[in-house]
């Protein structure tokens, strides 16, 4: 918003007679007394007129946008987080549609330089959109989790316990993974991922899935109190490869489960 205001002031200083500051109360004449009227200024898409009449609306929109970006996290509000994800998913097709429409408009008026920039923007947007789907499908192939299609998810922590696979989206690959057991509830990265757990249910290894590979973390240390089902377990990287993260319920040893390939 500040950048737009600075740009508007610069335009007004250099060629102020060409822009309407605001519509007069008595009609369409400009307050700055120019020969042109505000209707013609608005039809030409002048920035000063738009900001003077719509600055409050844009302020509200930007406040909502900032709130969604800052507090759109699961630990704050799932509702705001859902709105944030919806916005991020819709941005790709909206930007693609705008660049294609702008390319068509520029071609109609023979502005071929801007037409070329619009085509380049459309191609870049389309390629980035395809890359998002490719990486998401690769990650889903390993985890079978819908978190794979979260635009913010770069990796997924997978914990197999009680015959099930529990997942948690991550922004990056951790150096080590700590699982905390509090009164039978299992926590990872501060989030509760499972309940009804006991010390014996803690896995010997956990995995972090990436689109290109799966990293295996092996248990190296733990401190547990059996009477209250409370404690912690720490895992470090041991190997990486094309491993599946799905929980196996058949009669396989831990090593055979680990070597199960996608």
Swiss-Prot record:
Virion surface side, ranges: 18-47, 99-112
InterPro entries named in the record: ALPHA_CORONA_M, M_CoV
Residue spans, topological domain Intravirion: 69-77, 134-262
Keyword set, alphabetical order: Glycoprotein, Host Golgi apparatus, Host membrane, Membrane, Transmembrane, Transmembrane helix, Viral envelope protein, Viral matrix protein, Virion
Pfam families named in the record: CoV_M
Region annotation (Interaction with N protein) ranges: 237-252
Subcellular location per the Swiss-Prot or TrEMBL entry: Virion membrane; Host Golgi apparatus membrane
GO CC annotation: host cell Golgi membrane; membrane; viral envelope; virion membrane
CDD domains according to UniProt: alphaCoV_M (cd21564)
UniProt GO molecular function: structural constituent of virion
Keyword Transmembrane: yes
Transmembrane annotation, as ranges: 48-68, 78-98, 113-133
Main location class: virion
Membrane topology category: Multi-pass membrane protein
Function: Component of the viral envelope that plays a central role in virus morphogenesis and assembly via its interactions with other viral proteins.
Assembly with partners or alone: Homomultimer. Interacts with envelope E protein in the budding compartment of the host cell, which is located between endoplasmic reticulum and the Golgi complex. Forms a complex with HE and S proteins. Interacts with nucleocapsid N protein. This interaction probably participates in RNA packaging into the virus.
Family to which the UniProt record says this protein belongs: Belongs to the alphacoronaviruses M protein family.
Protein name per the record: Membrane protein
Organism, scientific name: Porcine respiratory coronavirus (strain 86/137004 / isolate British)
Gene name, Swiss-Prot/TrEMBL: M
